[in-house]
Design a protein with these regions (language model features):
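Glycine-rich, phosphate-binding/catalytic loops in enzymes
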Residues: 74-75, 112-113, 183
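Periplasmic OmpA/Pal-like peptidoglycan-binding modules at the C-termini of bacterial envelope proteins
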Residues: 115-210
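Short, surface-exposed beta-strand segments enriched in small/polar/acidic residues
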Residues: 58-66, 85-116, 139-151
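Short, solvent-exposed beta-strand/turn patches at coil↔beta or beta↔helix junctions
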Residues: 17-24, 52-81, 103-109
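Periplasmic peptidoglycan-binding/anchoring modules of Gram-negative envelope and division proteins
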Residues: 26-43, 68-98, 102, 125-129, ...
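Juxtamembrane linker/hinge segments adjacent to a transmembrane helix in small membrane proteins
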Residues: 1-63, 174-210
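Soluble periplasmic/extracytoplasmic beta-strand elements of cell-envelope proteins
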Residues: 45-49, 54-60, 64, 79, ...
Length: 210
């Protein structure tokens, strides 16, 4: 499983953990996802890993995208849709994480491996949203070539490093009420203004709004 400090938890995860808002149990989620993958016949390209905080669906990028592309292949959309059905009846927080190998060459579309992995993550998120997953409980992360599990020294290792991971948190995503703001606190007044400066100059001027 992917290694992150504190199990890869964000502030959202920390909040839900502190409040004990555990989502759907991993055993049930894993069964549903395994059935969806089996029905799609794509077990060769997808595997599932679990750690104390995350249930991770690792999807090989070769199944989802053409080389150096972030557009989901039409043939792969039904696979994502099946996974979405398995995730539709749970309330767990979901992250979509993008990874690449170290062979990407910047082109006119993507500047670097972070850019490519970010766009691929967003593309998968959008497919999940189209399939009915609430966008408010999803987020994307881009790791590019810098958080690989396998060595990039071999073709086999590079192939395994090119992936998108749909990671399901152990904790539920419960939206907190939005706070209504009618006026800015005095010490934050600068945030309502505009920042301006001259090209080539290190001087910055904050122009406060009325």
């Amino acid at each position: 499983a992917d290694k992150f400090e504190n199990g890869g938890r964000t502030d959202v995860d920390a909040d839900t953990q502190a409040e004990g808002k555990v989502g759907t149990h991993f055993d049930a989620v894993r069964r549903s996802i395994s059935e969806a993958i089996s029905e799609s016949g794509m077990e060769k390209y997808i595997d599932i890993e679990e750690d104390p905080h995350w249930l991770s669906i690792n999807i090989n990028s070769g199944l989802l995208f053409a080389k150096d592309s972030a557009s989901v292949l039409a043939a792969s959309r039904p696979v994502i849709a099946r996974i979405a059905v398995a995730l539709s009846n749970i309330n767990n927080y979901i992250r979509i994480r993008g990874y690449t190998d170290n062979t990407f060459i910047p082109n006119g579309i993507f500047r670097n491996s972070w850019d490519l992995s970010a766009n691929r993550s967003v593309s998968v998120l959008e497919e999940l949203e189209k399939a009915g997953i609430e966008p408010g409980r999803m987020a994307v992360e881009a790791f590019g070539q810098y958080s690989n599990k396998y060595s990039n020294k071999t073709a086999a290792g590079r192939a395994l490093n090119r992936k998108v991971v749909i990671a399901i948190s152990r904790y539920a995503m419960e939206r907190k009420p939005e706070q209504e703001v009618t006026s800015m606190p005095q010490n934050n007044s600068a945030q309502t203004g505009e920042v301006s400066g001259k090209a080539g100059s290190s001087d910055i001027e904050v122009v406060r709004g009325e």
